[in-house]
Amino acid sequence: MWLRRKQIVRKLTLGVVTTMLGMSLSFSALSATPVETHGQLSIENGRLVDEQGKRVQLRGISSNGLQWVGDYVNKDSMKWLRDDWGINVFRVAMYTAENGYIANPSLANKVKEAVAAAQGLGVYIIIDWHTLSDNDPNTYKAQAKIFFAEMAGLYGNSPNVIYEIANEPNGSVTWNGQIRPYALEVTDTIRSKDPDNLIIVGSGTWSQDIHDAADNQLPDPNTLYALHFYAGTHGQFLRDRIDYAQSRGAAIFVSEWGTSDASGNGGPFLPESQTWIDFLNNRGISWVNWSLSDKSETSAALVAGASKSGGWTEQNLSTSGKFVREQIRAGAGLSGGDTPTMPTEPTNPGNGTTGDIVLQYRNVDNNPSDDAIRMAFNIKNTGSTPIKLSDLQVRYYFHDDGKPGANLFVDWANVGPNNIVTSTGTPAASTDKANRYVLVTFASGAGSLQPGAETGEVQVRIHAGDWSNVNETNDYSYGPNVTSYTNWDKITVHDKGTLVWGTEP
């Protein structure tokens, strides 16, 4: 059950967004911006939700250091990123050291320019206090408190502002020793002026030690913990840390990642990057790529000399930039991206009547003998008339191996987990691969599926009634190698009781 705190609902004065001819754009003068759609963000049960209590995932890009390539941070470039790339969040990286804010406090004016642009464009913005070579955030704690007091005073009523108060603590700095005490003080400073905008806090070892933060979380309810990775350097061990942190109820935000190795060069490591992006998207974890710049490094999104104001063609994008743009566009549902929901035809279409419904499936968990069945599906309306979602029934067939009962969970749903209802049933004729099914239905609040539209991902997790391990290899609906969305006829869909997709066992 989703229990929402009372929230201060605040509005931005948003400019009218104009369309650009010849482009496939995410917004027009008739459609809502990300902030209009989601409003005030908060944390509930370790997940990022909008003001309606629906889970939301932010995807975007970060500037590089303002002292070096700050000219790329302006309203025109951010508008292009919103309209052509589909970003819903932008991160403005203000270094503290390395000729950053400490030596040049006027860089705060570029931060304010970026926030004003984000307010006008209706996108979320992360104000990043970019500690790095200074190792310990306490080195400039006094300056951080002054800076964030000003930012919170200016933007405490703007629901699109997010504060990142310690980019990458490193060296001998630990969560309990230095970072958490620092974060407590800076959070208090922010909360004295802004009661509820999100705060992101880094962890030790360049924001990799989120397991330490998860074990001793901050008391502020709207705090997320940053994890940073570079695909050529960091792999499964960090993904395992994310799973651990989430199991402890910690909210995770990947506020910086790159397609390169940790130096910013090498690669790009695109297969490794795709593994990471699939992992984050599967768990609904927000992410921001490094970086919007034309610097001579692999992780830069632009080639040397690219325009400072957007309008970039493919020739203006680096290999990394092309990949990241595709990933963001896919998440925003724009054409031309490498969309994870692009179907492949089933090898055995089956005998069910497809009608105007297509169901796509992917296996979320590659271990068929752990303690859970984890599956995800997406429904498409390929017809010409709207389909009322509450009329649909999705059935996932399995064999319970003699274990009674079931514990069912909705881990993710684009339509909102509160709009998904789960139960179990028994097929008319049991087989050695199917003596039960999980029934997934939609509440009336899910609305209708318009022609050409999709429900987006629904993730369901099924445990045996006694929480023992399961054996999925003999389950009718299980696809062991289906790790990306595929049209799947072994899960059925009924519309008002009539089979419209799939083949029953």
UniProtKB/Swiss-Prot annotation:
Record keyword Secreted present: yes
Known catalytic reactions: Endohydrolysis of (1->4)-beta-D-glucosidic linkages in cellulose, lichenin and cereal beta-D-glucans
Biased composition (Low complexity): 339-354
Keywords, ordered alphabetically: Carbohydrate metabolism, Cellulose degradation, Glycosidase, Hydrolase, Polysaccharide degradation, Secreted, Signal
Stretches the record annotates as Catalytic: 32-334
Main location: secreted
Signal sequence bounds: 1-31
GO CC field: extracellular region
Regions that span the bilayer: none
Matches recorded under PANTHER family: ENDO-BETA-1,4-GLUCANASE A, GLYCOSIDE HYDROLASE FAMILY 5 DOMAIN-CONTAINING PROTEIN
Enzymatic class: hydrolase
Taxonomic placement: Bacteria, Pseudomonadati, Pseudomonadota, Gammaproteobacteria, Enterobacterales
Gene Ontology molecular function: cellulase activity; cellulose binding
Protein name in the entry: Endoglucanase 6
